[in-house]
Design a protein with these regions (language model features):
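Glycine- and small/polar-enriched repetitive beta-structure motifs of secreted/surface proteins
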Residues: 1-294
Length: 294
């Protein structure tokens, strides 16, 4: 053992001695190094080399001021960083990494908790097994959740928030463009500002069950098996389609397939309510297929 002033050393092959004599070192176990003021290394093969650093367990490294590394081969390399677990890494100042192979990889103030959780940007938060928050200020919570853009939020199993300031909440949702929102199970929002809420929606702006809205912004599909597929379209109900600019369809088994068409009503299986360009169709199995007809 090598012992410096006002230090405590117990065990074998420990080192608390520095060139510029420090004080208050504690090394207990085998092959530990505690070489800055008020450092603590307990266990085997630990290194506490930053001022006031603490390394506890097996082969952990706390190399920056007031850093803490605990577990097995954990590393805390940023000032006031905390790394706890097996091969966990807290890279930058004020980072926290807790869990098996959890890691922070960017410039500071990030948190990764859970097996193989990764916080890959400043101010990012990753919670859950294999979660990944790689955007600045992003949040990923849940198993395999991923927030890959700045300010993105993904919460739930395999949910992905890939657009800036996008939100994905639930199971296997995908918000792929800026400012999109998906909530529920298996929803996708593919264009900027889109909303998909419910089950298996593919949406620009949709709420419901198995609805589709795409191509442009300002679309709404609400209900089940609906499609709003052009600019400023609205589809509400079941098996409703609004496919041209400004079209509105409400009810069951309805097609508003003309520009600025309005179709409202219901139809039995095998039938439809239809409206053409600038046309209005209202009622059971109503059809206004001529331009500007009612």
């Amino acid at each position: 053992n090598r012992v410096s002033t006002n230090s405590i050393v117990v065990g074998y092959a420990n080192d608390t001695k520095t060139g510029a004599q420090g004080n208050g070192h504690v090394a207990y176990g085998f092959g530990n190094t505690a070489t800055e003021d008020t450092t603590t290394a307990l266990g085997g093969g630990n290194k506490a080399t930053g001022p006031a650093a603490t390394a506890i367990g097996s082969f952990n490294e706390a190399t920056a001021r007031a850093s803490v590394a605990m577990g097995n081969v954990a590393k805390a390399t940023g000032e006031k960083s905390i790394s706890i677990g097996n091969y966990s890494v807290a890279k930058s100042n004020d980072d926290i990494a807790i869990g098996n192979q959890a890691k922070t990889t960017s410039t500071g103030d990030s948190i990764a908790m859970g097996r193989q959780a990764t916080a890959g940007n400043a101010n990012a938060l990753a919670f859950g097994a294999e979660s990944n928050a790689s955007g600045w200020g992003s949040i990923a919570t849940g198993r395999e959740a991923a927030a890959s853009a700045n300010f993105a939020t993904a919460i739930g199993y395999q949910s992905k928030a890939n657009g800036s300031a996008s939100v994905a909440i639930g199971k296997q949702n995908k918000s792929n463009m800026a400012d999109t929102i998906t909530m529920g199970n298996g929803n996708t929002a593919n264009t900027m500002g889109g909303i998909a809420i419910g089950l298996n929606n593919k949406a620009d702006s949709s709420i419901g069950d198995s609805t589709t809205a795409n191509k442009s912004n300002l679309q709404i599909a609400f209900g089940r098996d609906n499609e709003a597929t052009s600019l400023d379209t609205i589809a509400i109900g079941r098996e409703v389609k609004s496919t041209k600019t400004g079209a509105v369809a409400m009810g069951s088994r309805i097609n508003a397939n003309g520009d600025y068409a309005v179709a409202i009503g219901n139809s039995s299986a095998g039938g439809t309510v239809e409206a053409g360009d600038y046309a209005v169709a209202v009622g059971f199995k109503a059809k206004a297929t001529g331009g500007r007809s009612i």
